[in-house]
Amino acid sequence: MADEGDVLTDLDMDPAAGGNGADNRPTAGFITQYIKDMSVENPNAPGVYQWQEQPQIDLQFNIGANAVNEEVTEVELKINVEAKTDQGALYIIELVYAGLVGIRNLGDDQAHMFVYAEAPRILFPFARRVIADATRDLGFQPLMLDPIDFNGLYMQRLQQKAAEEAQGEGGETPAGDA
């Protein structure tokens, strides 16, 4: 312990108190983001530019995650868009927009939620811009995808999974003679 007149102070460097210099705080964040795969098709050009019918937009998305190592996970936001009319497809865009996420000292539940809810929420505006630019570059109006509530979808999926597990455990009676 330092005296009052001493310049040195007690920095509480006791390793048992966690002051060992190790980074043991919970952390999650992006390392980088990138287009992993992209396909853009305009299969009926140039005739498509003469069509008058409003296209139907079919949008599908999926979230994937791959562990790169113990602390890094690649999160993939997969978006497929097809604009079509009775005459055929105007355009087809398939995009896999990914990000490397660093996660350290988080519980499994928190890490899972970050990977499948928060990371896609952060990636989506960038993927949305890529889709808008691609449709514009195809010669059409930019397609501005509506925001997606990834946190709400994540919570809904957890509730659905819990209900399925509860139904599977006690809801069925065994077959056979009684």
UniProtKB/Swiss-Prot annotation:
Function according to Swiss-Prot or TrEMBL: One of the proteins required for the normal export of preproteins out of the cell cytoplasm. It is a molecular chaperone that binds to a subset of precursor proteins, maintaining them in a translocation-competent state. It also specifically binds to its receptor SecA.
Pfam families, per database record: SecB
Subcellular location per the Swiss-Prot or TrEMBL entry: Cytoplasm
Protein name: Protein-export protein SecB
Keyword field: Chaperone, Cytoplasm, Protein transport, Translocation, Transport
Lineage: Bacteria, Pseudomonadati, Pseudomonadota, Alphaproteobacteria, Sphingomonadales
Oligomer and partners: Homotetramer, a dimer of dimers. One homotetramer interacts with 1 SecA dimer.
A Gene Ontology BP annotation from the UniProt entry: protein folding
Molecular function, one GO term: unfolded protein binding
Record carries keyword Transmembrane: no
NCBIfam families tied to this protein: PRK05751.1-3, secB
Homology family: Belongs to the SecB family.
